[in-house]
Amino acid sequence: MRLYAVKTRLVKVGDKLVDVILEALKKQNIPLENNDILVLTSKIVAYAEGRLVKLSEVKPSEKAKELAEKFSLQPELAELLLHEAEKVYGGVEKAVLTLKNGVLTANAGIDNKNAPIGYVALWPQNAKEAAKQIREEIKRKTGKVVAVLIIDSGLAPLRKGTVGVALAVAGFKPVEDYRGRKDLYGKQLFITQHAVADNLASAAHMMMGEAAEKIPAILIKDAPVDFDEGSYGSAEMEMPIRECIFMSTFLSDAGNSKRVKGLRSSEP
């Protein structure tokens, strides 16, 4: 498997994203071939969709002000967080643990990093549909059948640093199910599933960086995935709360687990 960093110009609201990517590939002499996987940050997709919010135009509610005071957030950011998140569980200073589109993420995916001063970026409106449309547009403009993976940075419990998380996939199966297979010693596997899209997201995320690298896209060649014509969002990659080892342990109404102070009982 080979990964190529795709540096682009600064993407602005309303830019034609596919044209920006194809222009960058051509400039860097990176050939686009069938069964390549184009990995895009959620932010570059959100920019093209105009998913930027000017904080000075947000009016915080009393609930948002309370949340902001508790976790040292801007009240305007807290208001957006309450609007964007499906669930709010708790948090630490500057970060609130939320459920957004079936993904556990900080601050409902809202980010001021690499956004214009005074603005924040939201997640794409519909990442699954965006991945599908980008894939179709690339095929129309180049004749190449590629897959598209939209990612963001995420966190793993009790681990330092960010990892890549898949928000949507078009063109390959995001999860490989090992249940029913046998291991080296002939023992049957009962719960193992391989997070293919998340693993590719982490590989791409490592090359993209988190600061001023200007690498919002990665082209992956020879990836060991099961290509298809499907499009997949969080629903196809989400683990039900009652089957999730973390959530079923820490949320009391998700099973016979004990309540943990600071986390309120909740499920989607």
Language-model features, listed with the residues they occupy:
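N-terminal and secondary-structure boundary signal
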Residues: 1-268
